């Protein structure tokens, strides 16, 4: 029993050490080309403060980029954005689906979208008033959290 427990602890420690190697850099060349192009297209003024490269269990990478204006952008292993958080500034309008923009304009005319996250089920946006709105893949409103 002690031998099995010792082996289990050793295996867990080895696995944990293997994936504790997140890399933090300022070198934009560490990002996939798609991610670099995205940043250059939508965020021309703020510079990259740092990039955190996380390696997953199967070796896939994800990238978390912090810009000097505190904007945070997450990218998947292919360099496609998954999350853009501009804190209290507006997310670039070109990133927001038309139906989502229209819904926010009609129902929250005084608010700006400060964060957008896209996933398999659709899009979630956060407004400056901290309301969170969820939309399905077709851009239809699903729910709201405050």
Locate predicted features.
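Bacterial Sec-dependent N-terminal signal peptides
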Residues: 1-23, 39
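Interaction-mediating elements
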Residues: 21-146
């Amino acid at each position: 029993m002690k031998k099995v427990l010792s082996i289990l602890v050793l295996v867990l420690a080895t696995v944990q050490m293997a994936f504790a190697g997140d890399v933090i850099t300022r070198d934009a060349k560490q990002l996939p080309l798609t991610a670099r192009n995205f940043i250059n297209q939508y965020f021309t003024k703020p510079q990259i403060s740092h990039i955190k490269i996380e390696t997953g269990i199967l070796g896939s990478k994800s990238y978390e980029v912090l810009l000097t204006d505190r904007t945070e952008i997450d990218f998947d292993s292919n360099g496609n954005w998954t999350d853009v958080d501009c804190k209290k500034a507006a997310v670039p309008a070109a990133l927001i689906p038309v139906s989502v923009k229209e819904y926010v304009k009609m129902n929250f005319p005084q608010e700006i979208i400060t964060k957008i996250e896209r996933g398999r089920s659709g899009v979630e946006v956060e407004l400056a008033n901290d309301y969170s709105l969820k939309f399905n893949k077709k851009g239809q409103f699903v729910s709201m959290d405050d």
